Amino acid sequence: ISGHEAPVRAYLREKLTPHVDEVVTDGLGGIFGVKHSEAVNSPRVLVASHMDEVGFMVSEIKADGTFRVVSIGGWNPMVVSSQRFKLFTREGREIPVISGSVPPHLTRGTGGPTMPAISDIVFDGGFADKAEAESFGIRPGDTIVPDSSAILTANEKNIISKAWDNRYGVLMVSELAENLSGQKLGNELYLGANVQEEVGLRGAHASTTKFDPEVFLAVDCS
């Protein structure tokens, strides 16, 4: 999720390194392959996707061992309830959790059913109490993402997966680097991925400040 992009950054470093002149990072953690031009005063072109996805962060471990969370990035609360998630501790331990749901008869307001707030949704890892949850290394600030595998549709024409926004962009810049491998360019090219896009385009500010591109192509999807 935003602010915790290290695994995707490591993947991109591996994919970019064989095809570029150097790999650099910006001040926030965005990573970019650089292809230098032999031309003098050549234009600077930045092609950037983003590494982060939306998720949650533990804000409170309750006495009964369940968790309250805050959202990282934009979420529709209607798709959060009664779903499987993975919680990652500081030590990298993966904990299966499930999100609770409010019974329909408790969501009906005077004007009809109301949408639950993220702060009202409890996450449950099956722990007896707060002490047991903490014994597994769980702390406020731990991250939570959907527990979802990529699957091929029955007609084998499409893939269903979480985080297309923006793993697809990461794939595109990786393939662009491969396709341009060994080619001489008439411009300086920086291609890679920003961080913290889902929480306010923060990474884009860092990378554009670092590279000062004359052309910036954002690669994203939704």
Feature annotation, model-predicted:
Residues I1-S222:
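N-terminal hydrophobic/helix-forming segments and targeting peptides
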